[in-house]
């Protein structure tokens, strides 16, 4: 798609937004219902596209993309009317004889730039929030998941007037052309370097941005943890989508006292999940493309492999791999892995573990396995990270009742449920003041008799 076509799409959406058609709550609900029905109608197409692009099994496709997206859409449908209403606020003395309220209004013409690793979930969830809030939306899916992008385009073409939602497929040229346009809001999910680039381009028009990025999310296991449960849940979170998950446990920090037992249990759980030959398992996915395959494979140090380590270039598959005895300066600790490699480091004290995490860029997620409530509270309260779990992994992502997002190097802003609606809304504060009484002492000239009243009213 060329720059002229993209400019026309944006202009058409802006003209449509100015008709105020999207301000009607019933219209928003109808749009969400259309989205829900279209996703349901294309469940088989979505599953097939995910199998093509990423090798995802049907069950994983439903659990992590289709079902979760439908749940979020249903949540927006259920709450859009209440969230869209004006909400009364208390009035202070200075605004006596007034009605004080907040009113959420849509930003306008918005851009959602989606990633390839969960191409439906990470497009449909922000889309639902944007529609509930009353915006028009241009979606730019990743070129790395072409089958999924094609299905997304088909879903949106069937469900929406293009003046409300349009999908723009393509690669870098289309990204550049889109970022040349003036937007009222940009929502980006992807890598830190590209997120910085998007924010830089958005700053030229002072466009507000939400950045959902990533980072090296730590998983801490102390000596009190239920190791069998920890092993199962760590294996689930790490090997899901063959590690291509922004909130996957990136590395393991384990107390030296339980190191050997925990690694043995993770090996057992991994074999139970995928068998002795995971590269031949049809339910075990593949790396998205040859470029990423080469990058991930290059992070494997053969001398430190204690599980897996084998890669098959013809199918872009890499075994679930555990690296033990990893040092902080190793290559695998210098970047977000985004693949099925779990580096293991040890600690002697909780102070050491906390300092290790705090000395690095703020991660998107953190996981702490411990039966000690004081330890749980310590890491949750005092260690900086976006969100996380106690005695589990990644499940904080799977709810519409709490927001999800990063901080620092892992992003800014939140979405899911009410947070999605708020992310795509501007909240106006309104004072509606009566005219039958006008307090005189707020007006100049400020004579001496007014001083006492001014102090009373504004203190």
Model-derived regions, located:
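ALDH superfamily catalytic-core signature
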Residues: 160, 193-327, 350, 390, ...
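N-terminal Rossmann-like NAD(P)+-binding subdomain of aldehyde/semialdehyde dehydrogenases
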Residues: 1-101
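Aromatic/hydrophobic pocket-lining residues that form π-stacking "cages" and hydrophobic walls in ligand
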Residues: 126, 152, 198, 266, ...
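Conserved C-terminal structural/oligomerization subdomain of aldehyde/semialdehyde dehydrogenase
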Residues: 220, 271, 317-459
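Residues at or immediately preceding the N-termini of alpha-helices
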Residues: 6, 25, 43, 227, ...
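Rossmann-like NAD(P) dinucleotide-binding subdomain of oxidoreductase/dehydrogenase enzymes
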Residues: 91-229, 347
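Structural signal for hydrophobic packing residues in well-ordered secondary-structure cores
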Residues: 17, 21, 36-39, 43, ...
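Residue-level signal for inorganic ion chemistry
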Residues: 28, 73, 134, 165, ...
């Amino acid at each position: 798609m060329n720059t002229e076509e993209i400019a026309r799409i944006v202009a058409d959406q802006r003209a449509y937004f100015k008709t105020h058609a999207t301000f009607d709550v019933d219209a928003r609900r109808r749009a969400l219902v259309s989205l829900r029905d279209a996703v349901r109608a294309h469940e088989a197409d979505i599953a097939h596209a995910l199998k093509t692009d990423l090798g995802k099994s049907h069950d994983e496709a439903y659990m992590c993309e289709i079902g979760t997206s439908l749940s979020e859409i249903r949540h927006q449908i259920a709450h859009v009317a209440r969230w869209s209403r004006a909400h009364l606020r208390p009035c202070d003395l200075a605004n006596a004889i007034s009605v004080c309220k907040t009113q959420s209004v849509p930003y306008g013409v918005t851009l959602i730039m989606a990633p390839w690793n969960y191409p439906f979930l990470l497009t449909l969830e922000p889309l639902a929030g944007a529609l509930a809030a009353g915006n028009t939306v241009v979606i730019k899916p990743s070129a790395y998941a072409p089958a999924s992008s094609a299905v997304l385009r088909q879903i949106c073409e069937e469900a929406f007037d293009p003046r409300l939602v349009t999908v723009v497929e393509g690669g870098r040229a289309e990204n550049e052309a889109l970022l040349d346009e003036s937007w009222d809001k940009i929502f980006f999910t992807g890598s830190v370097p590209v997120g910085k680039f998007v924010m830089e381009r958005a700053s030229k028009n002072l466009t507000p941005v939400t950045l959902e990025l990533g980072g090296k999310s730590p998983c801490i296991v102390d000596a009190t943890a239920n190791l069998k449960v920890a092993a199962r849940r760590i294996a689930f979170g790490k090997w899901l989508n063959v590690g291509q998950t922004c909130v996957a446990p990136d590395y393991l920090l384990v107390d030296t006292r339980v190191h050997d037992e925990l690694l043995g249990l993770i090996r057992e759980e991994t074999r139970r999940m995928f068998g002795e030959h995971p590269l031949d398992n049809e339910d075990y996915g593949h790396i998205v493309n040859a470029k990423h395959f080469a990058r991930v494979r290059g992070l494997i140090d053969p001398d430190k492999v204690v599980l897996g380590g084998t890669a098959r270039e013809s199918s872009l598959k890499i075994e679930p791999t555990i690296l033990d005895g990893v040092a902080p300066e190793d290559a695998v600790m210098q970047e977000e892995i985004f693949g099925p490699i779990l580096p293991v480091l040890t600690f002697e004290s909780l102070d050491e573990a906390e300092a290790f995490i705090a000395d690095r860029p703020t991660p998107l997620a953190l996981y702490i396995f411990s039966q000690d409530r004081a330890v749980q509270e310590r890491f949750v309260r005092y260690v900086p990270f976006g969100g996380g779990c106690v005695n589990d992994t990644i499940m904080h992502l799977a709810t519409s009742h709490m927001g999800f997002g990063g901080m620092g190097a892992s992003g800014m802003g939140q979405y899911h449920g009410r947070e999605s609606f708020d992310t795509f809304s501007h909240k106006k504060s309104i004072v509606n003041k009566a005219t039958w009484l006008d307090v005189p002492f707020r007006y100049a000239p400020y004579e001496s008799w007014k001083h006492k009243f001014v102090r009373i009213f504004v203190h």
